[in-house]
C-alpha cells in the first residue's frame, strides 16, 4: 500500500509539473500574441484631432500596431528629426520643412512623399468678444493678438498674408519678421508669440488675447468658443499644403518599417480622405 501511495504521489507531481510547464508555454504564447508593433508619428499640432480619429479607424483592421504621436510645430518636429529622434512618419503643416528634409540624404524614404492636404488660415476671436476687427485689413484695431512664431507654418503664413496685404514690408524670408515688427505695423498692439497653433487656439478661445490666426481645421469642435472673423484668401497666404512621408528610422526593425508603410498607405487612402474632410481639411 505504501508503494502504491508513493507511486501515485510521484505521478501527481509529474502531472503537476507538466501542467505548469504547459501553462507557462501558453502564457508566453499569449504574451507574444499581444505584443504590438509601435509606429512613431511626428505630426503638426493642427493634425492632433484628426489623427486620433485616423488611428482609431486604422486600428480596426490593424490591432497589432500601436501608433504613438508626437504633436508640435512642424519646425520643431523637423529639428528633432534632423537631430536623430526616432520617427517613422512625418506629417508637416508646410512644404518648407519637408523640402528641407528631402534635401538631406537618408532621411525621407524615397517615393513616399505625398502633398496631401490643404488648409486655410483664419482670423478668429472668442465668442462674446466685442472686437472691432473684421479681418486682416483692420487687425490694427485689436489691442492684443496671438500669433505663432515665424518658424511655425501658421506663423509664416500669417506674416506672408500681412506682407501681401501691404501691412508689413516685403522681405526675403517672411519667417524672419519679428513680433516687434508686427506690433509696430499694427500700431503698437500687444503680440503674444505662441509656440504652435494649438497655443494660439487656446489663447484666443480662453479670452487671453482678442484675436489670433489659426487654421480653419483648428476651429473644428470649437464653435462655442471661437468666432471666425475672416477666412484669409489664398492670394494672401499662398496654398497651405500638408505633406506626409515615411522617415528612415535607424532604430526600427523590418516589422516596424512595414507597419509604418501600411499606416502611411492608410493616411493617403480614400477612407482617410473622408475623415480629413470631416475635420475641415481640403484634399490637395
Locate each region found by the language model.
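Surface-exposed patches in mature extracellular/periplasmic domains of secreted proteins
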Residues: 67, 110-112, 174, 276
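A generic structural motif
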Residues: 62-69
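Ligand-binding clamshell of periplasmic/extracellular solute-binding protein-like
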Residues: 69-79, 87-102
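C-terminal motif of bacterial Sec signal peptides marking the signal peptidase cleavage site
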Residues: 19-23
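Short, high-confidence coil segments that cap the C-terminus of an alpha-helix
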Residues: 64, 86-87, 209
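Bacterial N-terminal signal peptides that target proteins for export
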Residues: 2-11
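Exported/periplasmic ABC-transporter solute-binding proteins
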Residues: 24-56, 60, 75, 94-95, ...
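Acidic, polar ligand-binding/catalytic clefts
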Residues: 96-109, 114
Amino acid at each position: 500500500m505504501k508503494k502504491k501511495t508513493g507511486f501515485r504521489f510521484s505521478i501527481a507531481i509529474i502531472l503537476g509539473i507538466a501542467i505548469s510547464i504547459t501553462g507557462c508555454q501558453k502564457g508566453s504564447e499569449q504574451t507574444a500574441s499581444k505584443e504590438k508593433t509601435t509606429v512613431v508619428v511626428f505630426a503638426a499640432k493642427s493634425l492632433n484631432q484628426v489623427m486620433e480619429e485616423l488611428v482609431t479607424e486604422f486600428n480596426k483592421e490593424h490591432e497589432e500596431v500601436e501608433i504613438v504621436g508626437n504633436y508640435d510645430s512642424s519646425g520643431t518636429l523637423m529639428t528633432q528629426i534632423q537631430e536623430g529622434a526616432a520617427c517613422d512618419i512625418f506629417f508637416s503643416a508646410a512644404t518648407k520643412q519637408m523640402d528641407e528634409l528631402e534635401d538631406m540624404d537618408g532621411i525621407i524614404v524615397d517615393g513616399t512623399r505625398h502633398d496631401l492636404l490643404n488648409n486655410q488660415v483664419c482670423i478668429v476671436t472668442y465668442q462674446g468678444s466685442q472686437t472691432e476687427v473684421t479681418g486682416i485689413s483692420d487687425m490694427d484695431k485689436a489691442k492684443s493678438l496671438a500669433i505663432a512664431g515665424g518658424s511655425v507654418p501658421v506663423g509664416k503664413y500669417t506674416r506672408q498674408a500681412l506682407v501681401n496685404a501691404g501691412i508689413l514690408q516685403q522681405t526675403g524670408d517672411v519667417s524672419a519678421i519679428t513680433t516687434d515688427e508686427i506690433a509696430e505695423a499694427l500700431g503698437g498692439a500687444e503680440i503674444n508669440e505662441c509656440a504652435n497653433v494649438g497655443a494660439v487656439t487656446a489663447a484666443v478661445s480662453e479670452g487671453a488675447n482678442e484675436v489670433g490666426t489659426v487654421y480653419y481645421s483648428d476651429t473644428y469642435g470649437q464653435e462655442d468658443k471661437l468666432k471666425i472673423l475672416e477666412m484669409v484668401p489664398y492670394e494672401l497666404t499662398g496654398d497651405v499644403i500638408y505633406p506626409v512621408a515615411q522617415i528612415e528610422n535607424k532604430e526600427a526593425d523590418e516589422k516596424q518599417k512595414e507597419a509604418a508603410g501600411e499606416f502611411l498607405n492608410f493616411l493617403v487612402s480614400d477612407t482617410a480622405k473622408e475623415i480629413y474632410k470631416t475635420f475641415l481639411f481640403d484634399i490637395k
